[in-house]
Amino acid sequence: MADQASWLERFTRYLATERQLSPMTVRNYRFELERADTLLGQRSWQQLSRQDLSGLMARLHRQGLSPRSLSLTASALKQFGQFLLKEGLIDTNPAATLSAPKQSKTLPKNLDPDSVNHLLDIPPEDGLALRDKAIMELFYSCGLRLAELAALDVKDLDRESREVRVIGKGSKERILPVGSVALAAIGDWLKVRNQMPCQDDALFVSSRGSRLSHRSIQARMEKWAQIQGLSVGVHPHKLRHSFATHMLESSGDLRAVQELLGHANLATTQIYTSLDFQHLAKVYDGAHPRARKKGD
């Protein structure tokens, strides 16, 4: 398969257009395949065996790649092999049964409600402070991903219906309720935004009027965590985790939390049940007469 590079181009277009994967996922897949191509000596997929690819995975593992990274490598190889098989370029997919080491489950870290309230108690000193408060209120109110919030346009927010339209992973749309506190914060920000020379329809813009980048949003949140005196770092996903945990603690409705978070698989949401159990265990230890140690 002499024109393997051109098939990689076609594959990335297929991922972006037909599979509608995010640009970041497409870039990650491309990187994994280009790295594999280099390590395998740019051999044709028609010549590769499962043993070749297993050897590649073992080599990457010895180089210290994490289980998460190896899982991405295996996924990219499987998907590319399946694509070539479908296009009739190979007779069998050598990556079909490829596996990576199991990832250890790490519980997402979240803020307790008091810490969230402290973080969001931002004095309305200027327009940027109002904007940042609105951003963090919306993160916590809706459990949005960073990419979802950054992509929001003004038209996506229906203040009358108290809803926001979000485009999530795989270009899937979901309509989410927005809490009254977040709506009020966004309303204060929009008064400032309407007086700015905005260059596009983005809901959240910089002082120059351009859409806020992912990195800018992260940096502002880190700054506010320091200003507000929080002892831990704060990033968008931490507020998303906090939203999920607090919702589950209050409602116990795993399916509803799954829908709100935009998880395609309930198993992804179930990690929060471990956090919820930790909360219940603390309550039990503090309240049940038989749970307390003698002398407490």
Curated annotation (Swiss-Prot):
Residues 2-85 form the Core-binding (CB) domain. It comes from the Bacteria. CDD domains: INT_XerDC_C (cd00798). Residues 106-285 form the Tyr recombinase domain. The keyword rRNA-binding does not apply. SUPFAM superfamilies: DNA breaking-rejoining enzymes. InterPro entries: CB, DNA_brk_join_enz, Integrase-like_cat_sf, Integrase_catalytic, Integrase_recombinase_N, Integrase_SAM-like_N, Recomb_XerC, Tyrosine_recombinase_XerC/XerD. GO terms for molecular function: DNA binding; tyrosine-based site-specific recombinase activity. Pfam families: Phage_int_SAM_1, Phage_integrase. Keywords: Cell cycle, Cell division, Chromosome partition, Cytoplasm, DNA integration, DNA recombination, DNA-binding. One of its GO terms (cellular component) is cytoplasm. The active site is at 145, 169, 237, 240, 263, 272 (o-(3'-phospho-dna)-tyrosine intermediate). Its main location: cytoplasm. GO terms for biological process: cell division; chromosome segregation; DNA transposition. Transmembrane segments: none annotated. It is found in: Cytoplasm. Site-specific tyrosine recombinase, which acts by catalyzing the cutting and rejoining of the recombining DNA molecules. The XerC-XerD complex is essential to convert dimers of the bacterial chromosome into monomers to permit their segregation at cell division. It also contributes to the segregational stability of plasmids. Belongs to the 'phage' integrase family. XerC subfamily. Forms a cyclic heterotetrameric complex composed of two molecules of XerC and two molecules of XerD. This is Tyrosine recombinase XerC. It comes from Shewanella amazonensis (strain ATCC BAA-1098 / SB2B).
